[in-house]
Amino acid sequence: ALPICCVIRPFNADDIEPFMAYRNDAEWMQYQGFKGLTKEAYAEALLGNASLTQGMQLAAIDTATGTLIGDLYLKQENDIIWLGYTVSPRYAGQGYALETAMAVIDWCKQQGFLAVKAGVVADNLPSINLLNKLGFSCSCTEDDEQIFVLNIQSAH
């Protein structure tokens, strides 16, 4: 098991500026949709009353420093959870995306969800490699995204 280096929690107002710093980095965010917004727009999206069925963004915080290292997007679709993840470029390649994704998968299992899905642009190789490492398999392509699925409940 990985050491627990971060905690996943709802966003608070202090997270908005560090969130903007990487979300508005056009090169780093080339594969992402939620980017390039104003502080007010991010605050409205991140600090509102989000729900799993509407989709919610959560902060990934380094437990040692309290620093925002990235974020997760979760959306419930019946008994499936859609997962999105972003790590700040300052923290990329250190296993944070793997750790947070594993934590979400464990939580989804405990909640009784049947599968986790993620959509990835075909040339986003780091993300595809992460999903493969987690045991996801590519099920289909929709628009310009490959849809990866991980079935998390073993059949009885």
List PLM regions with ranges.
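Conserved GNAT-fold acetyl-CoA-binding loop/helix
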Residues: 27-47
